[in-house]
């Protein structure tokens, strides 16, 4: 059987194109499984996985837990709010204490960029990065590009624009890496204050006019404004942001083609996207959620296969 070139999923930038192809091929099989009446397979009955979330999460945490249980793994859920981390325990000590209970794999979300990379060098377990600060969110990028492949047949050659708060978004960076690795052309669009200075170094197009960006693209991935990561104001008001960078039905109808609308969630309805767009046939937002389980099953299964060797 083919195997991944990595022992951890720390970020898209560590993957090869063949790794993504293998994850997608495996996800295709698991998507068929999760649509059966009996949605469980016994693949990981001998694997224990700990979910360590040091930041709040709903969809990602539930998606990982469901993926793990669909594979029949034993699952431990860890909440930083009720842990010894609050008493000053270090990340390495926390994880090593958990691993001493014979845990094989750690899924971690952490506010500090690079936390997963740091951990992978100090503990003896497979690490999956479920989001590290404003750095990367690899499984989100995988499920996003998998959803594009499912909808349009291929990612290669497609024009994809990522709209919104690029500066604070781990989703944006991972998507840029994943899209480029699969041969897509990438543009970012948002207020200049929410575009990082290094963005052009990533080989992407930059546009501050939303209408022009949408006319160029095949797919628009709409990001929310991450107010929780902002210590200053980056635009005059939410109303003004919506007027310039919010997608509504009127704007989509003014285009000379039909584009695909995506959103990683949570959606701020009426801000970056209106309800009639979010709930329209052009939007594949719920497909992304469904595909997230299959993608995470694939990642966990492929990494666990390397543990078993």
Kindly give the residue locations of the regions a language model identified.
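A short helix->loop->beta-strand "cap" motif at the edges of active sites that frequently abuts
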Residues: 125, 183-185, 254-260
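Phosphate-coordination loops involved in phosphoryl transfer and adenosine-cofactor binding
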Residues: 44-49, 156-160, 258
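Positively charged, low-complexity intrinsically disordered leader regions
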Residues: 1-66
């Amino acid at each position: 059987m083919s195997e991944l070139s990595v022992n951890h999923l720390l970020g898209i930038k560590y993957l090869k194109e063949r790794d993504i192809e293998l994850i997608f091929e495996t996800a295709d099989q698991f998507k068929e499984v999760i649509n059966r009446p009996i949605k469980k397979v016994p693949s990981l009955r001998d694997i224990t996985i700990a979910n360590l979330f040091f930041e709040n999460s709903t969809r990602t945490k539930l998606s990982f837990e469901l993926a793990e249980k669909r594979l029949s793994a034993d699952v431990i859920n860890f909440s930083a709010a009720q842990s010894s981390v609050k008493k000053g325990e270090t990340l390495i000590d926390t994880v090593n204490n958990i691993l001493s209970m014979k845990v094989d794999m750690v899924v971690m979300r952490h506010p500090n960029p690079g936390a997963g990379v740091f951990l992978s060098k100090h503990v003896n377990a497979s690490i999956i990065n479920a989001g590290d600060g404003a750095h990367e969110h690899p499984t989100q990028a995988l499920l996003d590009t998998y959803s594009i492949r499912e909808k349009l047949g291929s990612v290669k050659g497609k024009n994809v624009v990522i709209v919104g708060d690029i500066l604070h978004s781990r989703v944006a960076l991972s998507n840029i890496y994943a899209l480029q690795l699969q041969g897509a052309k990438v543009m970012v669009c948002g207020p200049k204050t929410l575009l990082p200075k290094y963005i052009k170094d990533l080989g992407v197009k930059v546009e501050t006019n939303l209408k022009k960006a949408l006319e160029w693209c095949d797919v628009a991935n709409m990001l929310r404004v991450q107010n929780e990561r902002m210590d200053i104001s980056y635009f005059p008001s939410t109303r003004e942001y919506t007027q310039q960078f919010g997608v509504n039905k009127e704007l989509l109808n003014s285009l000379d083609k039909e584009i695909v609308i995506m959103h990683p969630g949570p959606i701020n309805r009426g801000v970056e996207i209106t309800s009639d767009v979010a709930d329209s046939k052009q939007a594949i937002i719920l497909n992304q959620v469904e595909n997230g389980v299959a993608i995470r099953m694939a990642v966990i299964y492929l990494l666990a296969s390397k543990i078993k060797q």
